[in-house]
Structure formats: structure tokens, C-alpha cells
Design a protein with these regions (language model features):
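Bacterial N-terminal signal peptides
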Residues: 9-16
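Active-site SXXK
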Residues: 99-122, 135, 306
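Active-site-adjacent helix/loop patches that line small-molecule binding or acyl-intermediate pockets
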Residues: 42-64, 72, 127-208, 214-219
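Short, conserved catalytic-motif segment at the N-terminal edge
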Residues: 70-99, 114, 118
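Bacterial N-terminal signal peptides that target proteins for export
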Residues: 1-8
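Acidic/histidine-rich, surface-exposed loop or edge segments in extracytoplasmic proteins
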Residues: 31-44, 88-94, 112-115, 152-159, ...
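Structured C-terminal helix/loop/strand segments within mature extracytoplasmic catalytic/sensor domains
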Residues: 23-61, 69-71, 167, 213, ...
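Short, well-structured active-site flanking segments
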Residues: 115-133, 144, 235-239
Length: 335
């Protein structure tokens, strides 16, 4: 009898082991992300005319601020002409340069969150709605920290031993894997944004010396913004929600001259008295960087994405609008 019981026990253990192993195989073989059925990356055609325009626009900024020692290495820019959605043209200046993006990374987290919600990976709550709004509209770092926790199933805390840290790091890198699955390269979007500094496991994950900080290129940023505008990243309803969060009232009054509507690309529209234009954007600003990712529509039919990243001139408000003004003045001349 004892032999029969022992044999049955072994059989049960074997079956459980086989079922577990088989289940793990099925899970690992399944795709991690569900992209929209009709999703395909925006097709971009390099345009010599746009390249000449963008080179001149960046050159105008370099000339204007040469007395302050603004150099080519301090500016990166990408321009996408969206007037013909079926035939997108683009150009870039240092567009593949990896640069710390500051709060521009929050746009990437917004898109990921909307994908998670659409796929049922997370369930929308009032607190999540509040966090998303504050992350994009007010550029709140605390809200971003919460949203990244939701996206990755990780949380801040004390440093971890190696094995536990590896598990935590794999989960935290899920947003990177999401964008890699769509063909994005040369970017890193796995870090929380802080008003001061990171501590504990966040500093451990950053690499202590900062070698795992968030990094974006203007090319990748412009591509994502164009895909949002064109409705490629999600449903029409979720696209509208994201666009509403990024809508900027540059013509309205503000108590903060450096807010996202009045302190970046919006300055160009204000200077040119283009109150009938429309602006959607996500800006980023630190002690060393000043960036903006903007989509503009004008009354005369111009539609374009312009992403400008600047380094080492964080408090110079007019570099980005100088580039934008030149684009506004000349894009309409290109057919």
C-alpha cells in the first residue's frame, strides 16, 4: 500500500511539474504587447527641401546666440511635415543624438499607459486619471512616479540584492520593450523624474553614476508625436484624450511665463501674432536642458511636428522659438 501511495505521489508531482513547465512555455511564447491590428510605423521620406529649411532654421538660432557661445553640439531638431498624411516628409539636425529628455519622456509614458488601458493590462481609476492629467498638463514629477509604478508593477524603496534587483529591473524595463517592439531605437524610457535626486533602488537602477538615465532622440520623439496626431498609437477616443492633454493655450494669459504654452514653441506663435494657430506639446526643462516637442496647425494649412532639444542653455527661452519661427515663415513655400 505504501508503495502505491508513493508511486501516486511521484506521478502527481511529475504532472504538476509538467503542467507548470508547459504553462511557462506558453506564456513566454505569447507576445508581450498587443499593438493595434492595423498598426504600422509612420512612413517618413527624407526631403531635401525640408532639410534645407531646417538647417537654415537651426543656423539662424546659432547665429542669433553666437555671442553666448551657442554651438551646433547644443541643438538637435527634427521636423515632420504632416500636410499630406499619406506622404510624410521629414528632416533632422543631429536627430539621432541621445539626449537627456527631462519631462518630454512623460509623453512616452502617456502613450504606454493608454495602450495598457486599451489592452486591459491595468484598470482606470480616478487616481490614475488625476495622475495622467497632472503628468502631462502640469508636468508633475510626483504624478509621473506614480504612473511609472502603474505601468511597470514596480515601486521605489531600498536597494535590493542582485537577484531581486534583476527581477525588479526586468519589470521596470517593460516600457522600453514596448517601444522596441515598435522599432524604436536609441532611446531609454525607464526612469522616474525627480525634482531633486533619486535614492535607494531608483539610484541603484540609474547606475549610481547616471549611465542608465532616460535618453531620447529628437527623431524618436518626433515620430511618436506624429503617430499620436495621426491616430496610429491607439483608438480615436484615446487619441483625442491624449491630444486634449497636450493642447496648449499660448494665446491665453498665464501667471507662469515658462509654462508649456508660453515658455517654449508657443513664444514663436505669440511673437508672430498667430492667435488663430493651434499648439499641442510636451516640454522638458532642467538646469541643463530646455526641450519642446510640438505639433502646430496654422490657419493657412500648415501642419507639422517640430521637436527641438537644447543643452547647456536651459534658461535661454528664445532658442526654440527662433527655430520655430523660421519653420513657420518658410514651410508654406515648400509644395
Amino acid at each position: 500500500m505504501k508503495k502505491i501511495v508513493a508511486a501516486l505521489s511521484c506521478l502527481v508531482v511529475f504532472c504538476l511539474f509538467y503542467a507548470s513547465a508547459n504553462a511557462q512555455t506558453v506564456v513566454s511564447a505569447a507576445p508581450e504587447f498587443k499593438l493595434p491590428k492595423d498598426y504600422k510605423p509612420v512612413g517618413l521620406e527624407a526631403s531635401p527641401a525640408l532639410q534645407t529649411l531646417l538647417d537654415a532654421a537651426v543656423g539662424a538660432a546659432l547665429e542669433k546666440f553666437k555671442d553666448k557661445n551657442l554651438a551646433a553640439k547644443d541643438v538637435a531638431a527634427t521636423l515632420i511635415d504632416l500636410r499630406d498624411a499619406g506622404n510624410l516628409k521629414w528632416a533632422s539636425v543631429r536627430g539621432e543624438e541621445k539626449i537627456y529628455p527631462a519631462s518630454v519622456s512623460k509623453m512616452f509614458y502617456m502613450v504606454a499607459l493608454q495602450r495598457w488601458l486599451e489592452d486591459g493590462r491595468v484598470k482606470l481609476t480616478p487616481e490614475m486619471e488625476r495622475g495622467l492629467k497632472d503628468m502631462i498638463v502640469d508636468s508633475s514629477n510626483e504624478a509621473t512616479q506614480y504612473i511609472l509604478d502603474v505601468l511597470t508593477g514596480t515601486s521605489s524603496g531600498a536597494e535590493l540584492p542582485e537577484k531581486e534587483f534583476e527581477t525588479w529591473a526586468f519589470k521596470r524595463n517593460v516600457v522600453n520593450r514596448f517601444y522596441a517592439a515598435q522599432g524604436y531605437r536609441n532611446i531609454n524610457v525607464n526612469q522616474k523624474t525627480f525634482c531633486e535626486d533619486a535614492y535607494g533602488i531608483e539610484q541603484q537602477f540609474r547606475g549610481y553614476k547616471g549611465n542608465n538615465r532616460n535618453m531620447l532622440t529628437t527623431n524618436a520623439t518626433a515620430r511618436l508625436l506624429a503617430e499620436i496626431v495621426l491616430g496610429r498609437t491607439n483608438t480615436p477616443e484615446r487619441t483625442l484624450l491624449m491630444m486634449n492633454l497636450m493642447k496648449r493655450d499660448f494665446a491665453g494669459e498665464s501667471k507662469d511665463p515658462d509654462d508649456q504654452a508660453h515658455g517654449f514653441t508657443g513664444i514663436a506663435l505669440i511673437n508672430k501674432k498667430m492667435n488663430d494657430a493651434r499648439l499641442w506639446s510636451k516640454a522638458g526643462w532642467t538646469s541643463k536642458t530646455r526641450h519642446d516637442a510640438a505639433y502646430i496647425e496654422t490657419a493657412d494649412g500648415q501642419k507639422f511636428v517640430l521637436v527641438v532639444f537644447t543643452e547647456n542653455f536651459a534658461n535661454e527661452r528664445n532658442i526654440i522659438p527662433t527655430v520655430a519661427e523660421k519653420v513657420l515663415e518658410n514651410l508654406g513655400k515648400i509644395k
